[in-house]
Each structure stands twice: as structure tokens, then as C-alpha cells.
Amino acid sequence: MSLRFIYGRAGSGKSQYCLNSIKKRIEEDIDRPLILLVPEQFSFQAEKNLIEVLDEKTGFKTQVLSFKRMAYRVFNEVGGITAKHMNESGKSMLLYNIIEDNKNNLKVFKKAAKRQGFITTISDIITEFKRYNITPEIILNNLENIEEDNLKYKMEDLALIFSQFETRLHKNYIDNEDDLTILVEKLNKSKQFDNAEIWIDEFSSFSPQEYSVLEKLLLKSYRINITLCTDYLNQGRFVDTTDVFSPIKNTENKLLQIIEDNNIKLDKPIALNCDPCARFKNSIELQHLEKNMFSFPYKEYKNETKDICMLKTLNQFTEIENTAKDIIKLCRDKGCRFKDIAVITGDLEGYENIISSVFLQYNIPFFIDKKREINNNPIIVLILSALEVLSKNWTYESVFRYLKTGLLDINNEEMDILENYVLANGIKGYQWTNDKPWEHKSFSNYELEDQVEKELLAKINDIRYKAMEPIISLNKNLKNKERAKEFCEVLYEFLCSINLPDKIQNMIEDFRAEGEVEKASEYNQIWNIVMEVLDQIVEAIGGEKISLKEFFKILQTGFSEYEIGLIPPTLDQVIVGSITRLRSHNINILYIVGVNDGIFPAPLKEEGILSDDDRQFLGDKGLEIAKDTKSIAFEEQFLVYSTLTTPSKYLRLSYPIADGEGKTLRPSIIISRIKKIFTNICEENDIVKLNGEEEELKNISSAKPTFNYLISNLRKDIEGVKIDNIWGDIYKWYFENEFWIEKLNRLVKGFDYTNQSKYIETKKIRNLYGKPLKISVSRVEKFSQCPFAYFVQYGLKAKDRKIFNLSYPDLGIFMHSILEKFSHELEKKGIDWDTMDLNWAEEEIDKLINEELDNKSLDILNSSKRYEYVTKSVKKILKRSIWLIGEHIKRGNFKPSYYELSFDIDGDYPPIAMELHSGEVVNLIGRVDRVDLLQKDGATYLKIIDYKSGTKEFKLSDVYYGLQLQLLIYLDAILTELAERFGIDGEPGALLYLKLDDPIVKNIVDMSDKEIEKSIIKNLKMKGLILNDPNIIKDMDNIISGISDIIPVMVKKDGGVSEGRSSVATKEEFETLRKYVRYTIIEICEEMLEGNIEIKPYKKKDGSSCDYCIYSSVCKFDTEIRGNKYNILIDKKDEEVWEAIKKKLEC
């Protein structure tokens, strides 16, 4: 019985010494068991290395074990375990059930139990307890030593959960974490390790469970050899936590304590002092880094480096692209093998997709060394979404998550048809499950013939029944089921009914045929995982009563804990992984990417359920558990040291200065430390682009990425930028390559691409727009915004997918409709706005809205609680609006005379006729919300009011550009009709926008009712253009003094109008605007009929017509594309507008 340490710094040859020692023992033909004990993740590599040292005949005499493998061997030898092992998934499901049953008994974790990830946290702490040999009884016995209430209650909760977990678990199962505890007991009966010599390698520390196993082995074996990565032995002395080797020296001290307690001999240690070390025999620089990285003081290396390099990049993508180029260069120019290269990072999740994308493009074979979660696998999504459909009452999201898994007998076209219908009509809940066919006809924005619509509706119902039949059967079969076992049985029958096992097998075969080995391996494991999860539910809680929602949660918890481990599909490939999973053997070249602050070294982890103070307190009371975050942070130094000393030939560290969102990233402290040691370190960056053939050669690697660089350089050449001659040779290579010639020709044609098509044939445009042209004024304004958007919307009639929701335009139309009906009700009853009873008016608004809802004219407002709230808001807004309109009318002499005045063939007035220069007549149609009239001095003055649900400003500049024409053309049309049809002398009074709203008043507590009303009136002040006549202004606001709070006017003390603070125009200016609007509309209509469909959106200081345009994916407007330019509209001052208008009219 003895212990021997084999120690040395990284790369000194400790592992090789163990292998050579084993070989020597075999050659000496010593009759004793020879064991190599390594961590589980290194067992495969250790076996491989041992076989390389030993020949095939002698290799069988040695066993390579991990602690887990050792446990299984002993259990097979002496027996003692009859129960099955429960995996992490089963543990989580069992813990979920325990916490649900005890949630009312928990003191601290009652609320936390509902949070996502809590089950995993509890599972982790129980694992920690077991590894530190802590039982529920030990926790309970120590409670009296805990004075602090919060910690005491925490430990009580943990003891309760832990105790019930142990009780329920051991009915049918055993926890994986119990293996080593049982191993300690069974080793007394085992003969396998009697007089054995054991070599223990690649460990930096052990858990208390593992120390207990080692103690037993030390008492049974001939000798245990343990490798320690350290520069010297501590021999039981105090350990400085800041020492990079402190974790190793702590391990040494604990081992020394064990042999001292058991009177076991300590053999003379083997010191592997080397200069240079075996690993770094070909690199003085890497040897220097190993010696000085954590040495104080350190020794500077002043020569230029070639084996250690740094790279600063613009972002993560260019960082990985540069890494790929460097790998290709090393393999191409220096004969390196992909299998000798590793790329690691402290943020694998953030880099994984980028590495996959770039390495595939550069044809670099790679394997990402990580376990894959299964939550996003379509099979798991199918199972969970099927149960979610039933537990969440058939919501759109859950139903289509289920349907879109690709595992049901419904194709994509059928799915799209069904989805469009469901979205358009808000199908949910019982509408899916009742036998009655769907009869809604509004499933598109297009008007279809009755027969076509009937056929499409029949098809939709056929798709619905086919798609929903399996899940409706599942729903029926789950009725009246209460126990977990019954739920599992019904779910299994459902999966078989949709032929899932056969479909999975077909998918595996397809993946293999397409060379997607990793995908095939993943799907090969999924069905077994599903069955294992169901089995563990049945075994652990099968007889317990649960609800469907609980069953869904338990399954979700179980699947979330599963991770699939994949075997590398080939040997010669780059290993990509995280720093914590780095396999240290046989890596010649190492790329560490993302060497940024907060990534490498890793930041302090969150403290978890037990804080650092809690752990310190418990440790002081003799209840030792895992290290606190500060201790782990000190151990991170050793991880950094181990990582930097892994490669034997070449190390490159790279760091981006910004992440994918453009946020600044700082380089890690490691970068500055290494720069101090290596004062002339090889340092590159891609931020400052250098010119020259050598730099261009760096971009020439694999065919695909080089082709992208060729595109960039050809574009520069076309734009007149001088490019390097080498790109001519590159172009020639692709041109002469059969595979690339077609792509190259498409590329060349692409340089002449433009998305513009300025005009189309007049005949075609006539077919699209109709003849004679009959359009609304708002459509004319739309054409002014962008001719192409107009063409797509009104020519091609392209529309958004119809969704069952309430848009702002829908709401606006609804409110207009209610106001119109209310106005006509006033007329019918002979009630004036300024004398109406407000209580009656509010009741009338309620009545009109309720009638609309009863008639289902706006069915959506009855569809949910949210829309009930919207309905209440609409009622409040309309009640506020009718009060406001009444206040406005009380303040003036204008009287409402027309509501929803229409211009159309069957309207109040005929369409507004516009004769083009060709003699053709264009008919404009439209509707005015309200027209108020004033009879004064033999003339009739018009006040035209447009109700708006949003804020709308009146800008002369927009009138000039054809963006704001409606009110002016309506004014012109009414004045013309009054004069020509009725001989009435009409005059412009005002053009106004009235916002329909119920604004929030601030500081309402300190205000009287009158002050509140005044604030609301001021808040909802109308915008527009007023006749510059003080008398007419008085007829609109008879209490005006200074700035009016209802119209955009300010009067001076002498009664005159302050033109600088008012939006006013004289009669002559109104006349000019009438002429200009007609001129502009004629000009726009002629452009329209000539076939102008140019992609030319306007752009102003406050935005562009592209901002809310739904057709951007159609036009693909981009100022980088030839011929794509904004129609820049400069906001003009009013005086500039008047000048410009006069000039145009004079032409």
C-alpha cells in the first residue's frame, strides 16, 4: 500500500510517463492488475494512446477506467444493484412532481418553484449534496446550528425535497450519483484491485465521493500513482489561493491527509522537470509562454514570434473567417492535418452558428464537441405541441406548431391554405373540434366567384379534418384519464397511430443517403429517448393522479434535461468546442476565439440557491459542500493555464472589437498579459485594410469564399476603382472551370441588374386601371408617394395576408360609421349639437355601438377580453368626441349641414370630373366627413371637417408635392356644385382635421371640472387652413382672444390676424390652391395613365414613404442598386410654397 506523486508542469510528459510505466510493468511480467484511471471524457483518448504505446498482444493486460466504469465493473463482480438507473431527465420529472405536491409546504422556494430552470437548479444542488456525501438526515441534524432564518428555511425546504426524492426514487430506481457511494461499500468485497498498481491521470481535483473511493483503493492496491500538474509539491503546507497551481496543491494536501489517517506509505515522488518540455520541444515560444504566463516576475521574450499570434477583428464573423483562412493556409502550405487543429471559445453558443456557416463555406471538415439539446427536434416539438394544443384550448400558435413539424400527412400547400383561413377568421378553441363545417367566407382579401369560393371552402374543410383527426382522437382518448401511466399509454398509442416510428426510420435513411451523418445519428436516438422518458414517468409516478397540464409540464421538464452526444463522423476534422471541454491530447494547433473580457476567462458565476455566505457558514459548521464562486474564480486561472499550454506547435488568440449588434467588446486581460511577455508578438488585424498582392492572396483560399471576393472586386472595377491584377487570373480560373462558369455568367449579368421598370405599355395599364379612370383622391395621393407602390396595390392588387385583428384603419372606419349614424339620429330627432342632452347622447353612442356588435358587423370586438377593452375605449373616445363637437359648435355660428357627403355616381354629388390634356375625363370619388355652413352677407361659407383617429397636420408644402389634396379638392368640388347647380355664391371658410381621442389630462387632482374640460379642448385643437377674415374667424370661435384653443389661429389685440402664428389663407390664395390642386391631379393622372410605375419613394426630413410600406419585399428598393433614388422633398416655408405654386400655374 503506497501513494506516489508524478508531478510536473504542463507539457512535461506526465501522461506519457504513465503509459511508459505501464508498458514497463508488462515487459517485467509482474503478475498484478494494471489500471489507468482517467476522467470519463478522456477515456476514449486514453485507450487510444495506450494502444499506440502497447502492441495488440499486451494491450489487453491493462484496463482504462473512469470512476463510473470502475463502479459498473465492481457491481458486475459482487452484485448488489438490482434497480435501474434514473437519468437526469427522470430526476427532473420526479422533482417536478415532488415540488408540485409540496409547493404549499415550502417556506422559501414557494414562488421560485414556478420559475423556469428551478427544477434544474434543485437537481444540481441534490447532485452536489450526494457528491459531498450529505444526506437529508445530515441536513436536518445540522439545522439547530443555523441561527439565520433565511438560510435555515432554505435548508428545511431542501431537506424536505431531498428526503422525498430519495424515498420515491429508491422504490424502483437508483440515482447515478449514488454509484460511487455504493462503490465504496462494495470495494470491500471486490478482488479486482487487490495488489493492483493504478495510475491516475488528467485530474486536477476530486469530489468527496471520489476521495472515499481513492481511500479504499489505497488500502487494497500495491501502489497508486497520481499525476499532478504543478511545479513543486506542497507537502501539506498552506496553499496560496492566488497561485495558479492552488487547485492541484489542495488536491495533494487532501491525499496526504488520507494516507496519514490510514498509515499508508508515501513513495518518493517522480519530478518531471524539463527544459524544454516534451510537448514544446519544437517551439521555444510556447515553452516560454508556459513558464512565464503566471510567473511573477516574468521574463520578456523580445524576438518576433511565429508560433504565437494575435488577431484583432472588426466582429465575430470576420474573426472566424480569418481563422478559416489561416487553417486552410496551414493545411495547404505546411502540410498540417485538420485532426491536429482545435478551435475553442468561452462562448460556444455565440460562435457555433458562425463557425458552422464559415467552415462549411471554406470546405473545412469540423466537429462541434458539445451535446445537443433535443427540445427543438421536430419529434419532440410534435409531442409537446400536441399536448399544448389540448391544454391551451387550441390556440393558433400551438396548432400550427404541431402541424408544421413535417411529421403529419399534410403538405405545405395544404398547410398554407389552412393557415390563411385560420388567421383571417380567428379560428380557435371549440371551432377546431366541433363537427360543423367552417362556413366563414372571408379567407382572403380578394373577391371570388361564389362557386370558386364554395370549392375552396370545401377543400379547406377537407384539409382541416385530415390534419386534425389524429389529435382529436388523442383528445377523446385522454378524456377521464387521471393517472400518469394512463396519459403515457394514450400518448404512445397516438404516436403509433400517426406512424411516427416508421417516419423516423425513413428520415434516418434519407439523412444517411444525403451524407448528413450527424442528423441521422440524432434521429436514431430520439425514439429511444421518448420511450425512456415515458417509461421513467410510469415507473416513478405512474400511479399518481395528475392533470393534462401537469403531464405536459412533466414531459417538457423531462425532455429539457436530455442532451444527445454524437460521435465524430470522421477522424480528420477540426475539433470545435468550449474551453471547459478541451481535450488536451494531440492538439498541435490551437485557435482560441473570443478572447474578450467576460468570455475568457469566464466571469463569476451566479451564486445559485446557496450564496457564498451560506456556503461559508455551512462549511464553518462542518457541513462541507462545493466551493463558492470566489474559489471557482481562482481555479479559473488554472483552466486558463491549461488551455494556453495545450498546443505543441502553434497558438493563435483572436478577439473582435464588436459583437453582432455592434456593441463594443474589450480584449481580455490575457491579451495584455501576453503582450507584456512577448514584446514583439505577431499581431494582425482586419480593421485597417491593407493593399497589395500579399494581402489579396490571403483572400484566395477555397473556391466558394474566393468567389465572393471576386464579386466584390469586379464591382469595384466596374465602378472605376483600381483592383489588383491577380483578380484577372482568378476570373480566368472560374471562367475555365465547368462547375463555376454558369455562376460566373449569372454574376456578370447581375452587375447590369436594375429593379426599375419606369413605364409599361398604355394598353396594359388601361386593362389594370380601367377606362374611364375612376379613382379616389386618396389613391392620387398614394401615387405621389411612390408610383410603384400605387401600381402594386391598385394595379396588381397585391395585398397583405388577411389577419383576424383590428387595424387602425378598421377602427377609424368603425368610429366614422358610428359618428355618421349619431349625426343622422340628431337630424331625425331635430336635435341641435349645441343643445343636445349629453347623457342622452352618451346612451345613444352606447346603443349604436352595441347594435353594431349584435349585428356582427365588427365581429372581432366580441372575440376576446382585449377587444372588449378596445370597445370600451372606443365608446369613451366617441363620447368625448361628440361632447367636443358640441363645444365647437356652441362656440361658433357655423352649423353642421352635411354628414358623410359623398362624390360618386350614386352619391350626394356626382364624381369630380377632371379633363386631361388628351380630352379624356377622370372621375374622382370620395367622401367628406362633415360640412358646416354659414350664411353671411349674401354668401355661403364652407367649413369642411375630416375626422382623424390619429394626429394629422396640414402642410402647404405637402399640398405642393401632391401628398395632401383631399380637403382642397372637396372644397373646390362643393363650391363648383353650389355655383353651377344651385346658383349659390359659396366661399371657403376652413379646412380642418379633428382628432377623435380621449386624451389623458395631467395633474387632474389639482384641477376643477372646467379646467379639465379646457385642457381637453386645447389638447384636441383642430389643425388645418382658415380663411384670413377676422369676422369669419369669430364665427368659428366667438370667444377667441389671443391664441384660439379650437382652431389654428391667433388674433392680435387690434382684432387682426397674426399671420405668423396662424394657419390662414386669403380668398385669393384659396382660389389659387383650388386651381393648383386641379392642375396637380391632372398631372398625376396623366403620369399614371402613361404607365409610370417607377420605384421612386419620397423622402422628407421626418421620414419616407418606405417607412410603413408593405411592398418593400416586392420592389427591393436600395440606393445601392443602379437607378434607385429617393424623390427628395424639401420642406418649404409657406411663402416659398405660394411662390412655387404661382410659378407652376403660370407655366
Curated annotation (Swiss-Prot):
Classification via PANTHER family: RECBCD ENZYME SUBUNIT RECC (PTHR30591:SF1)
Protein keywords: 4Fe-4S, ATP-binding, DNA damage, DNA repair, DNA-binding, Exonuclease, Helicase, Hydrolase, Iron, Iron-sulfur, Metal-binding, Nuclease, Nucleotide-binding
Function: The heterodimer acts as both an ATP-dependent DNA helicase and an ATP-dependent, dual-direction single-stranded exonuclease. Recognizes the chi site generating a DNA molecule suitable for the initiation of homologous recombination. The AddB subunit has 5' -> 3' nuclease activity but not helicase activity.
Further details from the record: Despite having conserved helicase domains, this subunit does not have helicase activity.
Residue sites binding [4Fe-4S] cluster per the record: 786, 1106, 1109, 1115
Cofactor: Mg(2+); [4Fe-4S] cluster
Subunit structure: Heterodimer of AddA and AddB.
Family note: Belongs to the helicase family. AddB/RexB type 1 subfamily.
Domain of life of the native organism: Bacteria
Cofactor: how and how many bound: Binds 1 [4Fe-4S] cluster.
Pfam families linked: ADDB_N, PDDEXK_1
UniProt-listed Enzyme Commission number(s): 3.1.-.-
Residues annotated for ATP binding in this entry: 8-15
Gene that encodes it: addB
Protein's name according to its UniProt entry: ATP-dependent helicase/deoxyribonuclease subunit B
Principal EC category: hydrolase
Molecular functions per Gene Ontology: 4 iron, 4 sulfur cluster binding; 5'-3' exonuclease activity; ATP binding; double-stranded DNA binding; helicase activity; metal ion binding
GO biological process: double-strand break repair via homologous recombination
